[in-house]
Amino acid sequence: LKIAIIKSIINNTAIINSNFEKCMFIDIQFNNCNFSNTIFENCSFIRCEFNNCKLTGCDFNENTLLDTNFINVNMNYTNITISDLKNVYFKETRLKNANLQNNKVKNIKFQEADLTQIQIFQTSLNGIDLSKCKIDGIAISIDDIKGATINQVQALDLIYLLGVKII
């Protein structure tokens, strides 16, 4: 049994340390909301937008994120695992110390996102432009970063993947 919330605007709401299971969020705009440390288990976010929200420490497990935007969102320490992400946009969003693991991704975009110390495993970034993001201390495998677009400075953050040392 799924709970569905459809075509709504949710403003200035705080729902922290909570659990959402098998929920569908369709055509929802979240503005200035705080969902810190909330678990979203087997949920779907379809055509949703998060604006100036706080999702610190959230767990997105076995979720579907389709046509969803995160604009100026604090997602530090967030876990996104075993999820499908299609047409997802992260703009000016902080994902410091976040974890992306075992995800299927298609057409995701990062614009000026802070990916400092993010851990990405079994989530391919092939074809994704990271050149305008901060990736200091990123933990990622060579297979997952292969095919991503990075700038010259970022290349130094990823040189360890080649097993070489710069002196």
Model feature map: region roles:
Residues 1-167:
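Tandem repeat scaffolds
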